């Protein structure tokens, strides 16, 4: 264990040393590194898929549920998507060096801010191997060194991805030490990593509630956490039924194992008799289990093919990460807002309505990182928000909120232009 701890410290030291030349690397050089990464992924597809297959087989042998297994799978289509996102990050404007908030003082001093990298970012994450590429690419683009620590369930995939990323960075003339990967999945090493505040500037955990809580409780370093998603869709009394069905279906079914998938459907009592059978019929085709309150049960009890069970108090405020939806009929928008305020996690909330006043109340009163009107909750995503990709979706209010892109992993320094002024 002592040797492993020393290796962690050495990786952090190397990342800190590499962060300095990376901080002032040219945009062209950083973009070249990202394009190299994307091409390396495509050129080494068979090896990546083979490594991922090992992860899949080990996950199946350990009894991982199919819904969770989906999170770690890389197939050819997903690999091409990861490469595409990396090319997209390369095409984004470089935030580093941006000058803003410039003002001329009465004494003639010109004072403003210049955007700079944070330095070294440690990313601790679970399940999805695409996160290895997304986070490394975003950190490099923003001039930050990165220390990657993925979960044991994707160790084979993450190992080859990190190796290819380092090769691509070095080919672009940047220090490969700017990307560090921790192969050892012992959690005790994470605890040690979280104490290296002299070498690491920010920790970003991505994963379940247990991981995020552990990092927050044990870190000596500032943490921006990608929080859990207890996500609601509220169907208002005068919603367009076809839109509401499509949004509720997409929010739940399109990819149920991710944090922006809907967990609870709130339905106004006036539209429930028409809307609920319609959405239940669509959900039944996808195998969605409905955990319904008493009012919803009465409406849906004769719906053919519907997986219907009574909701329990524990179902409200639960992140299912599966084809399960809690359904509640509410008397008013006020009741829906109160329910979300009590049970929501501050991630994403959506209203389906044709009433402008209702939409504005929802936007104003719901406290969440992303609040939507007539749109699927699945859009809360870095690529969908035009960020290229994301480091995570923060449910905090400091230092970043919502999908974290390039600007969220930079800081600024004050710059002052004078012409000989002295303070009297």
From Swiss-Prot:
- List the Gene3D superfamilies: Aldehyde Dehydrogenase, Chain A, domain 1 (3.40.605.10), Aldehyde Dehydrogenase, Chain A, domain 2 (3.40.309.10)
Gene Ontology cellular-component annotations:
cytoplasm
Transmembrane domains' residue ranges: none
InterPro entries to which the protein is assigned, alphabetical = Ald_DH/histidinol_DH (IPR016161), Ald_DH_C (IPR016163), Ald_DH_N (IPR016162), Aldehyde_DH_dom (IPR015590), G-glutamylP_reductase_CS (IPR020593), Glu-5-SA_DH (IPR012134), GPR_dom (IPR000965)
- Which pathway or pathways does this protein act in? Amino-acid biosynthesis; L-proline biosynthesis; L-glutamate 5-semialdehyde from L-glutamate: step 2/2
Q: Which GO terms describe its biological process?
A: L-proline biosynthetic process
Spell out the disulfide connections: none
Kindly state which reaction or reactions the protein catalyses: L-glutamate 5-semialdehyde + phosphate + NADP(+) = L-glutamyl 5-phosphate + NADPH + H(+)
| Enzyme Commission code(s) on record | 1.2.1.41
Sorted alphabetically, which keywords does the UniProt record give? Amino-acid biosynthesis, Cytoplasm, NADP, Oxidoreductase, Proline biosynthesis
One protein family per Pfam: Aldedh
GO molecular function list: glutamate-5-semialdehyde dehydrogenase activity; NADP binding
Its function, per the record, reads:
Catalyzes the NADPH-dependent reduction of L-glutamate 5-phosphate into L-glutamate 5-semialdehyde and phosphate. The product spontaneously undergoes cyclization to form 1-pyrroline-5-carboxylate.
| PANTHER family per the UniProt record, alphabetical | DELTA-1-PYRROLINE-5-CARBOXYLATE SYNTHASE (PTHR11063:SF8), GLUTAMATE SEMIALDEHYDE DEHYDROGENASE (PTHR11063)
Q: What NCBIfam families does this protein's entry cite?
A: PRK00197.1, proA
Q: Can you tell me which family this protein belongs to?
A: Belongs to the gamma-glutamyl phosphate reductase family.
- Name-wise, this protein is Gamma-glutamyl phosphate reductase
State the organism named in the record.
Dehalococcoides mccartyi (strain ATCC BAA-2100 / JCM 16839 / KCTC 5957 / BAV1)
């Amino acid at each position: 264990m002592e040797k492993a701890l020393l290796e962690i410290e050495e990786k952090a030291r190397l990342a800190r040393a590499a962060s300095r030349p990376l901080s002032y690397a040219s945009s062209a050089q950083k973009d070249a590194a990202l394009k190299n990464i994307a091409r390396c992924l495509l050129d080494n597809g068979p090896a990546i898929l083979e490594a991922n297959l090992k992860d899949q087989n080990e996950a199946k042998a350990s009894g991982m549920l199919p819904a969770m297994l989906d999170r770690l799978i890389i197939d050819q289509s997903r690999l091409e998507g990861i490469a595409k996102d990396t090319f997209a990050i390369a095409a984004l404007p470089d935030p580093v060096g941006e000058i803003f908030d410039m003002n001329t003082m009465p004494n003639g001093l010109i004072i403003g801010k210049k955007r700079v990298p944070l330095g070294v970012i440690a990313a601790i994450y679970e399940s999805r191997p695409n996160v290895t590429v997304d986070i490394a690419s975003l950190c490099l683009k923003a001039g930050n060194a990165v220390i990657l620590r993925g979960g044991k369930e994707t160790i084979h995939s993450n190992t080859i991805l990190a190796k290819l990323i380092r090769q691509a960075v070095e080919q672009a003339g940047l220090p490969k030490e700017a990307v560090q990967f921790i192969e050892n999945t012992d959690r005790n090493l994470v605890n040690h990593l979280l104490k290296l505040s002299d070498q690491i500037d920010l920790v970003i955990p991505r994963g379940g509630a247990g991981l995020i809580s552990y990092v927050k409780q044990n870190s000596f370093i500032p943490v921006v956490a990608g929080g859990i998603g207890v996500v609601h869709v509220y169907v208002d009394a005068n919603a367009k039924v076809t839109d509401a069905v499509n949004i509720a279906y997409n929010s739940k079914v399109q990819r149920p194992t991710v944090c922006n998938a809907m967990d609870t459907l709130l339905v106004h009592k006036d539209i429930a008799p028409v809307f609920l059978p319609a959405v239940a019929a669509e959900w039944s085709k996808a195998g969605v289990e409905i955990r319904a309150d008493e009012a919803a049960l009465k409406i849906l009890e004769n719906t053919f093919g519907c997986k219907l069970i009574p909701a329990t108090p524990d179902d409200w405020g639960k992140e299912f990460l599966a084809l399960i939806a809690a359904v509640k009929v509410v008397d008013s928008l006020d009741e829906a807002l109160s329910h979300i305020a009590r049970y929501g996690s501050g991630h994403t909330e959506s209203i389906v309505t044709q009433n402008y006043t209702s939409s504005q109340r929802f936007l104003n009163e719901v406290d969440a990182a992303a609040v939507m009107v007539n749109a699927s909750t699945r859009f809360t995503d870095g690529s969908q928000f035009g960020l290229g990709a994301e480091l995570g979706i923060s449910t905090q209010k400091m230092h970043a909120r919502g999908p974290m892109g390039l600007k969220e992993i930079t800081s600024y320094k004050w710059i002052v232009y004078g012409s000989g002024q002295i303070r009297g």
